[in-house]
């Protein structure tokens, strides 16, 4: 269960043979789906920045950056400050125009042949992902349109015999009229609802927000317990399949996205 970079961690664990049998369900929040299956998707370029590298590729990129910075041996590297090493990738890119794994930080997994034999996308396309139920989704005003990649992933899981439940969070967060605040259903906004942590925020939450949070918290809990967001009694949220290509839309009413002036949500 993870969101954003945490969602990418879930994807990595799902692709790692060393993690087999260590988890029985997986929730991927705001980490897109498949990138290679939809190369024209607006998220493909973004997700490619986090594409796994081989161990040899990552070592070569690291050496290039260190040599450029004059850190040509271990003594010099160890003498450099943590802050300098941490920022070195960004400095290198701004000066040279070259992007490395050090630019994106430690969120790009390494295909080392041990923990990872292949990328998440390749593992999915080669039917080497963990065969567990999946819940996967994003927010209306996320970092990009993740719907195509998520749909492709769900169809891929259908072919593998796994269930995959897709969702979109489309409730624009309420504001008190102040400027310079995040608006809409932005990246990470759904976490307030999943954890029902409204009391830790200044936003003027409504009774409807509390009700929506209860619905989402129940769905996440049911999925964690039963592998089905509906629970043992069943419900309206069916897996995304070729015959049922539908996302569950979490919002208060049909006017949510229109009123927010942030764009139209997906249709359930």
What are these regions (language model features)?
Residues 6, 34, 85, 142-143, ...:
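Surface-exposed, flexible loop/turn segments at secondary-structure boundaries
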Residues 11-15, 20, 25, 29-156:
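Substrate-access "cap/lid" subdomains that shape
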Residues 139, 157-268:
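Mobile gating loops/cap/lid regions near enzyme active sites that modulate substrate access
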Residues 3-12:
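Glycine-rich nucleophile elbow surrounding the catalytic serine of serine-hydrolase chemistry
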Residues 2, 82, 242-245:
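Acidic helix-start/capping segments at beta-turn-to-alpha-helix junctions
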Residues 8, 56-60, 147-151, 189, ...:
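A structural signal for well-ordered alpha-helical segments within the folded catalytic domains
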Residues 1-3, 29:
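Short beta-strand immediately N-terminal to the catalytic nucleophile in serine-hydrolase-like folds
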């Amino acid at each position: 269960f993870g969101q954003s970079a945490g969602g990418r961690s879930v994807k990595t664990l799902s692709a790692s043979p060393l993690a087999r049998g260590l988890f029985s369900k997986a929730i991927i929040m705001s980490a897109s789906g498949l990138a290679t299956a939809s190369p024209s998707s607006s998220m493909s370029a973004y997700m490619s920045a986090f594409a796994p590298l081989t161990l040899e590729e990552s070592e070569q990129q690291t050496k290039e950056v260190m040599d450029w910075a004059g850190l040509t041996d271990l003594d010099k590297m160890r003498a450099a400050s943590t802050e300098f090493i941490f920022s070195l990738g960004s400095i290198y890119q701004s000066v040279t125009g070259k992007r490395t794994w050090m630019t994106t930080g430690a969120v790009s997994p390494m295909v080392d042949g041990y923990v990872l034999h292949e990328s998440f996308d390749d593992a999915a396309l080669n039917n080497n992902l963990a065969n567990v139920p999946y819940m996967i989704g994003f927010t209306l005003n996320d970092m990009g349109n993740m719907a195509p990649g998520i749909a492709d992933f769900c169809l891929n899981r259908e072919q593998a015999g796994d269930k995959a439940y897709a969702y979109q969070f489309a409730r624009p967060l309420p504001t008190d009229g102040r400027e310079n605040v995040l608006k809409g259903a932005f990246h990470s906004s759904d976490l307030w609802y999943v954890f029902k942590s409204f009391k830790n925020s200044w936003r003027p939450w409504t009774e409807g927000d509390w009700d929506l949070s209860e619905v989402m918290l129940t769905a996440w809990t049911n999925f964690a317990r039963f592998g089905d967001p509906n629970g043992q009694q069943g419900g309206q949220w069916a897996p995304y399949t070729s015959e049922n290509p539908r996302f569950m839309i979490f919002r208060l009413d049909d006017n949510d996205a229109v009123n927010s002036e942030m764009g139209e949500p997906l249709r359930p």
